């Protein structure tokens, strides 16, 4: 009670009079009765910057819907498309329209008024104060005046607003004002953005995506396995470093390492060419880093018998005379028997050259200022899971056993499973940032283990790299990666409800929102599962998955009316979007409709505001006593 009295005393400093308390209570109660803001969910971006940038700009079709709502009967389809493109890419589209001699004062008047009406529509669910804060500073006063215009008896306001517009045009400031309006529209269209992991992977520009996310007004991230891999590399895990380098070599995205983060591949290239006989330099480099990786993995596995990953120790199972490797109780043909740096008497020991290479990589990773900025952002905005407005968000899984019971690990004689296990994993990720050696090693466990909540499968990198696909009859079975039973059990509504209860979510509209596993739409898979309790939104942004999924990604929109999922078709290019007004074609499917519209008072933010109201009411009692 004494602590609360101290709190009220501090609160009194902020609200020194009864009238100031009344004013804030009126304001907070008004906010509680506004519609909840729109939430936008995206997952598995995989470094695909262009498609991500476009979907961020079009807000998964929200802006196109608002344009159609306002101007469906007034503008042609082409004119609506052009207006949308102008909102998505204002400077680029303006330049093209100017080259086509379409831009004049009359054009500015029409378009600016259209943009003002769109901004007015989108701002209607927010307080005027919040809208004002969202406005570009240079035009905040002017935009505030124009979008809150009200007709008066003598039409004085209309004359006033027309004069504002004419002054903007006479000063040749129309371009900047237009850009400011489009920025506001995009900001108001989505109140909060959720990224369900895997910003990184095979795409070339995860760094540009992170730069864009760092500019976003309201975002959270649920870490994916690829995010954890990069975080582990920056924290000093050599296995994670080798994996990051290997992945970027495999997908030919080395520019993100060298140009994005200043991580040099020059010494690896020299070493590979001098050590391996492959005629193709890329093959030699890939083999060199792969061998280093498996040596480092072996060292880590031996340091941590509690991981129970001895089955991944395969270098010592090779018979180079026969060109085979024993996995389990079977011998498989290797696609090469050239392992000049592997001493079969001590196969997991790095050579001096390999140690030198890893020393260089370590220095580059931990000293990269650009990477540090991005990793700090991932730590600041990220978590293993998030509970938000009655939904449970995570990238991978909540590990289960075959019977659908929560599974996990034992650490220091203590068993962790369910929510407690996910909390433990997050604490280890955060400890890794401090340099704790066990926590740093644990980052690789999270990348590779079937019990990892961000991965949930047994990663078979060695098999996919060194088994001969032509000479091994059961090659496909050998490289098949076992998945955590979660990925079968999550089709069951009872299991999903059990998971939701584990996180204290009992509402009938509570959902698990999940990424990580591409939804194979062309095979009949559906993103909404388990009686509507589970929504999987990894539809494959990455072009490499399009053939398997049949689409180009899913996103999810949750507004005050309910939830709808967006199924996206492949995106051509930003240039085509700008030049030909080609938006991403998307189909919408309603997940559910709220029985009653959701207001701020029904959200997590509403609960916080309710506590503030309660505190202010108690402060009022102090003033009245």
Predicted regions, residues:
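Feature recognizes metal-dependent phosphohydrolase scaffolds
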Residues: 1-625
